[in-house]
Regions:
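Walker A/P-loop
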Residues: 35-73, 77, 86
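Canonical AAA+ ATPase core
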Residues: 87-90, 113, 117, 127-201, ...
Length: 327
């Protein structure tokens, strides 16, 4: 599959999902960027904004198997990974797969489960395999996790440590729809019998795997690589940041920028691809200083200043395009 074909597939997927989910286009593109880059998504938003529907709709549009794990304080690692069950008639133990064995996994309210259970999910995300009783089992491919958490409630939750947040390619939010979009949501509800809309299936697992291979063919100039390094370095030297983005964050920024270029139908990365994905890719990887937190300085504000402080390179024209003029 070439970039042009991949771009067309991406447009088809977004159209299918947007028919079911009332959300800003940039949010849906951020989730698709993570899927293309073989990453995972953390959605932090209040209840009722469509987090679960988003996960189901993407799984349906992509033709992938889907499972939902409701995280609770009493959830055990085995409830996620699966366990061995003794078969009395056979006199043997048989492994029963847990809900993690799906292409698209929704980890709902991930911060409600204790750290040990969270760690079981994070291991699966990082290694794409699970280990039960010393036996390692690979997870199906493609494998994407969308985890959600509610930013409002603080009682009975176990906040994700920075090291675990770092495993997510992007962190994003849906937000409330515009009044016009919300009216359209109500009109659509009156025209269907089902309580929940469904996205049309437009791909399958093999198609998704071919789609995920395309970003690796996207060209990245040395100037763009330098730009990515400079942006990440700026997060580490900003006085309001105690801990900046890690080298893993640098690599994820590159991967997301390449995926973004594919969505835009380009075979090369432009600076605007980097700036577009920088906030969802880097925001959750920064730890602000105590003073910045007390002052109410958010990571979005820090990243805006970081991007303003770094010189934007001029990339050579390709594919008949005029040279970009960002910055």
């Amino acid at each position: 599959m070439n970039v042009s074909s991949a771009c067309g597939e991406c447009e088809t997927v977004l159209q299918s999902v947007s028919a079911a989910v009332v959300a800003d286009e940039s949010f849906l593109e951020t989730v698709l960027t993570a899927v293309l880059a073989e990453g995972h998504v953390l959605i932090e938003d209040v209840p009722g904004t469509g987090k679960t529907l988003t996960a189901r709709s993407f799984a349906s549009a992509l033709g992938l198997s889907f499972s939902r794990i409701q995280f609770t304080p009493d959830l055990l690692p085995g409830d996620i990974t699966g366990t061995y069950v003794y078969r009395e008639d056979e006199g043997t133990f048989t492994f029963t797969e847990g809900p993690i064995f799906a292409n698209f996994v929704l980890a709902d309210e991930i911060n409600r489960a204790p750290p040990k259970t969270q760690a079981a999910l994070l291991e699966a995300m990082a290694e794409r395999q699970v280990t039960v009783d010393g036996e390692t089992r690979p997870l199906p491919e493609p494998f994407v996790v969308i985890a959600t958490q509610n930013p409002v409630e603080s009682e009975g939750v176990f906040p994700l440590p920075a090291a675990q947040k770092d495993r997510f390619l992007v962190k994003t939010e849906i937000g409330y729809p515009e009044p016009a979009a919300e009216r359209a949501l109500l009109r659509a509800r009156t025209r269907r019998e089902a309580r929940t809309p469904a996205a049309e299936t437009v791909l399958d697992a093999d198609g998704v795997r071919r789609l995920q291979a395309v970003p690796e063919s996207v060209t990245v100039d040395d100037d763009i690589l330098d730009y990515i390094v400079d942006v990440v370095e700026q997060t580490r030297t900003d006085a309001r940041v105690e801990v900046g983005a890690s080298p893993r964050g640098t690599q994820r920024l590159l991967e997301a920028a390449r995926a973004r270029a594919v969505i835009e139908g380009r075979s090369f990365v432009r600076p605007v691809d980097v700036t577009t994905v920088a906030r969802p890719v880097l925001g959750h990887r920064l730890i602000r200083t105590t003073d910045a937190t007390v002052d109410g300085t958010g990571t979005a504000e820090v990243l805006d200043d970081v991007l303003d402080a770094v010189s934007v390179p001029t990339v050579r024209a390709e594919d008949g395009e005029a040279p970009p003029t960002e910055g």
